[in-house]
Amino acid sequence: MRIAVIGATGLVGSVMLKVLEERELQVDELFPVGSEASIGKKVKFRGKDVSVLGVAQVVSLKPDVALFSAGADVSREWAPKFVAVGTKVIDNSSAWRMDADKKLVVPEVNGHVLTRDDRIIANPNCSTIQLVMVLKELHELLGIKRVVVSTYQSVTGTGSKGVRQLESERNGEAVTEAAYPHPIDKNCIPHCDDFLENGYTKEEMKLVNESGKILGIPDLKLTATSVRIPVSVGHSESVNIEFQRTPELNEIRLKLGKAVGISVVDDPTNNLYPMPVTSEAKDAVFVGRIRLDESQPNSVNLWIVADNLRKGAATNAVQILELLQEKSPINS
């Protein structure tokens, strides 16, 4: 299989290369794509140096699959051009997620919706992926009535600029290009992406809209608050879920414990619960602090953590590719 990675020198793109290396997909040719400033640079893939190419050149090479992680503007411009030459596109940006004609996929949740005819498949927002992994299991078990989620998101969710700002502030250096309107070190900023007229941010509304689409519940009652925190990798979520029937904690732990891609870490008496530092570089979604909400009936609180660069982005995209291969093998 001939695979292009658009944005290969960025945070998510570089992790995509790692994930492709780790998994058993056959990669006959790799085309790393970067900005004009990156063309000619080398990236490592399976022990070899591979030159970064320009996107127009790679379109002409007609790869079998293109994994996009270069922002919505790049995806809107170039994804259709790849499709026109027969390439299947898996896009990590927000460009196509809410397009009625495009699938928005988390393989463990709604992988069944993929078909061999899909040409552009959208990869959900990082915070959405880890949330719906858990919501899907609990909706099957108890029926979800309402969800309240607060997210605590690492600076890698903003890209290299966010990482540089945090590192500069921690090192006492001047910030030459700020990713945030306020200092991020020793701070929490309740401002992820732009604010909308309804008072929510785009990030918060992504959680609302994408979750409903993925779960097949267009009228899902979900409200969100998203906060940027001074952590390098890993998004955390405090989630309150109201169910249609009375939950039992043991059945919740059992259901989540059996779910593919979910790891239950819930032993607070021994200080065991999910944390960004223990989820980094792992593909699982970690769940803990599972407890009844004593303020209202039929409700639980829980805590979800995942590596936003892996399951929240790169790994999920590669899993979509693997699922496409199962449904319609691509043989170069």
Set out the residue ranges of the language-model regions:
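N-terminal Rossmann-like NAD(P) cofactor-binding subdomain of oxidoreductases
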Residues: 1-184, 219-221, 285-286, 290-296, ...
